[in-house]
């Protein structure tokens, strides 16, 4: 009896740039052999807006409102690194109160970033409910930002060279503490819903595994790196702002799969709440209303008017010149290492403004992870990376 031999030709498939699970305008050219992924080629650049070139034609004061559009899920980190680079190069001192306020805003942004990752990732896996839950919590962060900065999600335009744009308003500290008390039980609720769910575990455990050596060699950072067994967090390594004043731990896992990346991010939300509570408790001068009362009671030229109790050190003029020299400044964003390589030329405009986006580097490993996997695992692996195309394409 003769057997018929069937041969299948590899199929080339386009995913994106309008696919709902692409997390922006990312296009993947997939080569498939049946259900198996043979090759993957990411096509980026659909959201390129020339952010580095724009920076070379704007003063630092003018450029801060632009930067929220890089990683539009976490705009505060972009603002932080945008002012940190000129501060380091020009030797601008930042008051301790301003530094504490910055840390509070950055950690709120880290929580918001991880919440916005959590919802769509679970939707990619097949769980729709948490997608709506996380917006409830994120809305409260928006309200806090709106009270402090005047804007909700992006374009807060809050960070300044030498400090922040305005002090925290009346009652803001109490509202922030209320949010911290509210969030922790909700994170526990997420964990009860998701972490031990057998369907979720089978979708993510052992999928998209990255070894410690691979994570380092590919230049990964953030939860992608820490989930592969590398204890590397720039808040501990670089000692920037005032993170050394607080008691908190670097969260990490060793498995390196999608589940490990999920666990790291969930734990980081708890650590962020821990940092926010300590920053509010140790805020120099206390809440704004208390600080105002102390200043009025002590009269002019009191200790409460000292440098460390200001929200900004010295307001820089619109003609603030970036000194001649070069520097690399970086912060630990929700996605990893966000860096700026700045070249100054004793001019109001920078000579070069190079952006090192965390998710641009993290996206590089996706084709390597997808080869040999099933089609159903594509969106799970991509979702676990946490990619925002505004930051990748810039």
From Swiss-Prot:
Classification via Pfam families: Complex1_49kDa
Cross-referenced Gene3D superfamilies: Cytochrome-c3 Hydrogenase, chain B (1.10.645.10)
Membrane topology recorded in Swiss-Prot or TrEMBL: Peripheral membrane protein
EC number(s) from the headed UniProt entry: 7.1.1.-
One Gene Ontology MF term: quinone binding
Keywords on record: Membrane, NAD, NADP, Plastoquinone, Quinone, Thylakoid, Translocase, Transport
Main location: membrane
Record flagged with keyword Thylakoid: yes
Subunit annotation: NDH-1 can be composed of about 15 different subunits; different subcomplexes with different compositions have been identified which probably have different functions.
Function: NDH-1 shuttles electrons from an unknown electron donor, via FMN and iron-sulfur (Fe-S) centers, to quinones in the respiratory and/or the photosynthetic chain. The immediate electron acceptor for the enzyme in this species is believed to be plastoquinone. Couples the redox reaction to proton translocation, and thus conserves the redox energy in a proton gradient. Cyanobacterial NDH-1 also plays a role in inorganic carbon-concentration.
Protein name as catalogued: NAD(P)H-quinone oxidoreductase subunit H
Recorded name of the encoding gene: ndhH
């Amino acid at each position: 009896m003769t057997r018929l031999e069937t041969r299948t030709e590899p199929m080339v498939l386009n995913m994106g740039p309008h696919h709902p699970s692409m997390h922006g305008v990312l296009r993947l050219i997939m080569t498939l052999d049946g259900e198996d992924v043979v090759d993957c080629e990411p096509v980026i650049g659909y959201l390129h807006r020339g952010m580095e070139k724009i920076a070379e034609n704007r003063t630092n004061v003018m450029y801060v409102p632009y930067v929220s559009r890089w990683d539009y899920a976490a705009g505060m980190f972009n603002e932080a690194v945008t002012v940190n680079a000129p501060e380091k190069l020009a030797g601008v001192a930042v008051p301790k109160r301003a530094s504490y306020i910055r840390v509070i805003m950055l950690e709120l942004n880290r929580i918001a970033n991880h919440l916005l990752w959590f919802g769509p990732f679970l939707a990619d896996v097949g769980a729709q409910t948490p997608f709506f839950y996380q917006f409830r919590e994120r809305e409260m962060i928006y309200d806090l930002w709106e009270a402090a900065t005047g804007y909700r999600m992006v374009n807060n335009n809050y960070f300044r060279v030498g400090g922040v744009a305005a002090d925290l308003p009346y009652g803001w500290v109490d509202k922030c503490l209320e949010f911290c008390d509210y969030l922790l039980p909700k994170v526990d609720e997420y964990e009860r819903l998701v972490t031990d769910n057998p369907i979720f575990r089978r979708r993510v455990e052992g999928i998209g595994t990255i070894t410690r050596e691979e994570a380092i060699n590919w230049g990964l950072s953030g939860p992608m790196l820490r989930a592969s067994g590398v204890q590397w967090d720039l808040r501990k390594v670089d000692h920037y702002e005032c993170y050394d004043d607080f008691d908190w731990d670097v969260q990490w896992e060793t498995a390196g799969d999608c589940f490990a990346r999920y666990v790291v991010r969930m734990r980081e939300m708890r650590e962020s709440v821990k940092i926010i509570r300590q920053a509010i408790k140790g805020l120099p001068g206390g809440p704004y209303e208390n600080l105002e009362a102390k200043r009025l009671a002590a009269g002019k030229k009191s200790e409460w008017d000292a440098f460390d109790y200001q929200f900004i050190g010295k307001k820089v003029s619109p003609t603030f010149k970036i000194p001649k020299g070069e520097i690399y400044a970086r912060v630990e964003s929700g996605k990893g290492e966000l860096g700026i390589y700045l070249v100054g030329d004793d001019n109001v405009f920078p000579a070069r403004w190079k952006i090192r986006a965390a998710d641009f580097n993290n996206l590089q490993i996706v084709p390597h992870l997808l080869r040999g996997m099933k089609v159903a695992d594509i969106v799970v692996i991509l979702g676990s990376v946490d990619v925002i195309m505004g930051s990748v394409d810039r």
